[in-house]
């Protein structure tokens, strides 16, 4: 029988498994994280502004790489190789269009159309500090259903 939570002199356990707690950051570390956050946010909003009818997702990918570099950041997703995958991820972004729920791969063949619902996801790395951010946009004015989806999703965050 495992105890829900207990501590020993050196270790803390939850449901019988050792857990690590988050180390409190110094002001300098917080400031460094903020630099990565600003790079990620500015890049994401640049991509949002470029999401227009006729744009292809590979062009958005290349724009993201350029923007991240201009803010002194490296794309953390590019060449990321998780243990479960045979190959590393080849892109700086995940761009999902319509029914591609998450982690869509950019492609020259994926051209944005009026009403598309597009998820933009990226991770900025500045000196080892990572900022992971995502945003969903509707291309053009979209339809009532898509607008409602984004509205309800946004409201659920707060």
Regions found by a protein language model. Give the residues of each.
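Active-site neighborhoods and metal-handling regions in enzymes and metal-associated proteins
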Residues: 3-158
């Amino acid at each position: 029988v495992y105890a829900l939570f207990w501590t020993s002199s050196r270790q803390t356990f939850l449901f019988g498994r050792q857990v690590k707690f988050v180390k409190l950051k110094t002001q300098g570390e917080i400031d460094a994280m903020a630099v990565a956050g600003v790079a990620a946010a500015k890049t994401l909003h640049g991509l949002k502004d470029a999401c227009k009818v006729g744009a292809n997702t590979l062009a958005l990918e290349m724009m993201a790489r350029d923007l991240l570099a201009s803010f002194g950041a490296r794309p953390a997703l590019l060449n990321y190789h998780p243990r479960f995958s045979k190959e590393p991820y080849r892109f700086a972004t995940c761009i999902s269009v319509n029914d591609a729920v998450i982690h869509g791969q950019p492609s020259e063949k994926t051209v944005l159309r009026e009403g598309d619902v597009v998820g933009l996801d990226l991770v900025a790395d500045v000196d080892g500090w990572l900022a992971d951010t995502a945003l969903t946009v509707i291309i053009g004015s979209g339809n009532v259903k898509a607008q409602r989806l984004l509205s309800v999703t946004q409201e659920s965050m707060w």
